[in-house]
Amino acid sequence: MRLRKIAVALMTAGLALGVASGTTYAAGGGSGPKSYNAVGKIGAVRMNPYDLAPLTAIIMNGGYKITGVSVSIAPKGPNGVALAYKVSDRKVLNHGGIPVWGLYPDHVNKVEVTYDRHQPGPTGSPTERITETYSIYAPPVSLLGQGVNQSTVLPKAVVVTPAAPALRNNLYLMNHLSPVLPNAAQVVWNNPAGGALEWDYESYVWIVDTSGDIRWYMKTDVLRDPANIYRKGNMMGFFQGKDGTLLWGMSQRYMKYDLMGREIFNRVLPRSYQDFSHHAEETPNGTFLLRVASSDFKRRDGKNVRTVRDVIVEVDRDGNVVDEWRLAEILDPYRDVNLKAMDQGAVCLNIDADAAGKTMSQEQLEDPNAGFGDITGVGPGRNWAHVNSVNYDAADDSIILSVRNQSATVKIGRDKQVKWILSSPEGWKGDLAKKVLTPVDLKGGKLDCQGSKCNNTDFDWSWVQHTSYKVNEKSRPGALHLTVFDNGDSRGNEQPALPTQKYSRAVEYVIDEKAMTVKQVWEFGKERGFGWYSPITSVVEYQARTDSMMVYSAVAGMGDVKALRAGKVKLEPWLHEFKYGTKTPLLEMKFTESSTIGYRSLKVDLESAFR
């Protein structure tokens, strides 16, 4: 009885408080006033609204209908870059308010927003055009690091050649990876063996403006968990679609998020595949191309293995498999001429100071007792191909691949037939030998080439290359323009007398697919020598909006792997943009104090992200 009286008394008091404050309560649960305070004329400011992007915020709509939104963020200091963008009405609805992107870290940002605020009431109620300025503090960059041999969270960008006016508002996504950390690479595949599950580095993804200031970064530990095989691995292959969202992969997953950090999807690979790395791309058909490997492959000797970086899968928007390219059945997985010439100290991100300068013999490559997995060797189940880019050619429904460990760029049709091979002719056999392109000069005359070397010309093949991309805007029938980052290790299918003779190049080729010829029309990097040399990773990509060539030598300074591991040298990647067809820099930026390994850079379009 006493408990009942207490309950009635509490209920009565609660009702009295509700009436006094003007609050009403909905049946089935409590409902009261909002507990946050609006700081402007709509709602509160919510920082990092999706947990993934700490330098973003949403100015909540406060219950109002908001349309006609534009946002600008004031530059920091005299050399800072102002950011300004419009937000479509549907994006305002997606985010429940005004999305704010590009805040400076550890800084009170001045953010001006302009919008139409619709008064409560039926459709057609009056609207008010409002402009107001918010002061929004964003916290410092905070990411997991290695702790030792590290002086900054992320590399510092130093502007060497200021951006030309046409490039002033450019934004560059940087994708780097850590050295192997103690909690990484602790598991391998088994039953069957092989694959590259242990390829597991902490990932660093951030965006800089043309003054080198950080304007966005990803809190990668929200997505990564090294203790979970389906949430570990390297974040790689970032691609921005026409809708402004980012597509990328991470070992056993591929995912799509918008620039605010909102998840579109985050999926495990289809069961026939494993070990995504390097490249993801959306086709004009709305499908996705992913560089993966086979989770169960039957070799000619009857053994079942997991393969390594030698399969391309195409999936639709719902994650259904559309097609696949199994390169061990299309190319020659036993071609070893380039494998024997590669410096084993730097095979993509597998950096081994003890193996620096060493090569492998044919006997080692073909050792029947050798294991399977992420090791240099011939045949399915070993790293014979190492495909690091996949580029769709809508002109004939084909794919163009950079097959690093073969020092070859290869075009393959939907029918799985090889159309052409851009590579030194050495080691190609049978029908594949007939697909190797013939080098010609600018006038179409055949060059004097013997094996892997061409005389009296600047023409060269590309060696352990990255990012073989068609330049759609320049190509026409009979002239397919192709850009390649020629890393330069194993140049001429050999190691030079001195490591310091090595160099890298950004190259543009023009291919006549009917005549089966190739000519070199532009290069940069040879003149920069060993200091600009990147034995692994890197990118060159044509930029249509500014008619320029973006080049990122992502691990410049890694030429001496032993000195790097001993802490005697530091990586200093270089980011450039050149006026098309020239070596005139429109922008040059050097990254210093780097304790990370550069992979790629990607120009980001802010307008499409909020359209």
What label would you give each PLM region?
Residues 17-25:
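C-terminal segment of classical bacterial N-terminal signal peptides
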Residues 10-18:
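Bacterial N-terminal signal peptides
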Residues 81-89:
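Solvent-exposed beta-strand/loop surfaces of large extracellular or lumenal domains
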Residues 1-10:
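Bacterial N-terminal signal peptides that target proteins for export
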Residues 28-75, 89, 93-97, 105-611:
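Histidine-/acidic-rich catalytic cores in large beta-rich domains
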Residues 11, 22-23, 122:
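Intrinsically disordered/low-complexity terminal segments and short unstructured peptides
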